[in-house]
Structure formats: structure tokens, C-alpha cells
């Protein structure tokens, strides 16, 4: 049976080192705590998928040697792989290559900034990679990047000459795929939570609106945000709500 690795790309959830663009409105301690909630929710989502699909969850983490920072955060069955490389592209490519060398038939690398990412989207990525033929599966992020990349071979050219953390990442990656004649499957768009605006959007969706169609309920994240709102009102983290 071919197993697909579902790898969460993650920094060790240390105060002052993660989610720094959420400070303010959050404090550095709150940002680290929210990062832990994101990891718990996304890992739980992946774990549930692995119970019914040919998939296995792990965290692709940085910095090397920080495994203890994830203690009590991830499911017991999750494995660890340290990120290697200077740029994001190098880290993604190296992780894909290493996991394929370990015997996985395919690899999906997923950012850890989208706690409500629907389970159905992840399953669609798995099913696409299980089909015959080579391809790249890309989850289109609303900011012009991608929240997921799935591959059956580590096509290093996909990651070359990309201006990472810009709105051109997805478009340039699709261009790279076309240059090497690699078919692309695009997944439905979703959003990253990486600044005050997207935090407010997440808070509004989890606490004040009906859930988006198919969105993962992110119970750890929801409880964290709800605690802040109940304690001091919504204006600090969700000022756009009427």
C-alpha cells in the first residue's frame, strides 16, 4: 500500500519566535499559545484523516534539536523531520526528497497557519496523488502563495528562482511546472492566519458566524480566542465585527 506523508511545516512554538506578525494585537506569549493551538488542531485533523486514508502525519520542524518544544502538542503517532536549507524552497524540496527516500509514495507539505483548513481538501490532495501519473498538487492561498504542495517526485526546479513570501509564489510555481511539463492540480483557495486582519477574520468565523462550508472547527483555536473575548471583549482581536 502506498502511503502519503502529511507533513506540517512548523517552527518550534517558542515565545517571541512564532507568529510575530500577530504582535500586536496579541502579546508574544499569546501568539506562541495560539501557535500551539493551530498545531494541535491541524495535527488532530491530519490524524483523523490517517485513520481512514493511506496517510501518515508528521511535523517538519525548525530549528533542529527543538523536538521537546512540541511535547504534548502533537499526537503520539506523529514523527519528526528537521528542516534543512536556507530558503523556504530548499526546505520544502529537501523535506520532500527525504520523505520519499524514507519510502513514502507521495508527500504533502502543509503550512501550519490554516487551522480551519477543510478535511475534504486534504483528502482531495491524497486522492489526486494516488492516481497514476506524475503531478504537483497545490493548495492556492488567498495571498498568492500556497498552503499545500503535494508531490510524488522531488522536482527541484519547482522551487528555483521563487521570491518566497510574495504574492507571486503560486503563479511562479505554476510557471515552473509548465516549464518541466508537470501537470498541476489546484485545490480550492484557503487563507493563512499571519497578521491582525486574518486573525480578526478567523475570530469572527469561529465565534460569531456560521462555519464556512466544510471548514474544520479548530476546537483548540476556538477555545483560545473565546477565552480572550469573554475576558475583555472582542475589540482587541476582532475589531471588525459589528
Functional labels for PLM-detected ranges:
Residues 35-53:
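A short, N-terminal amphipathic alpha-helix
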Residues 156-174:
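Short, glycine-/small-residue-rich phosphate/pyrophosphate-handling segment
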Residues 175-242:
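Conserved alpha/beta core of the MobA/IspD/sugar-nucleotide pyrophosphorylase nucleotidyltransferase superfamily
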Residues 69-106:
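Short phosphate-binding loop-to-helix
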Residues 117-143:
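Conserved donor-nucleotide/metal-binding helix-loop-beta segment in metal-dependent transferases, i.e.
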Residues 1-21:
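N-terminal nucleotide-binding beta1-loop-alpha1 segment
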Residues 108-110:
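Short aromatic-hydrophobic micro-motifs that form the base-stacking/packing surface
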Residues 54-63:
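Short beta-strand/loop segment that forms part of the nucleotide-sugar
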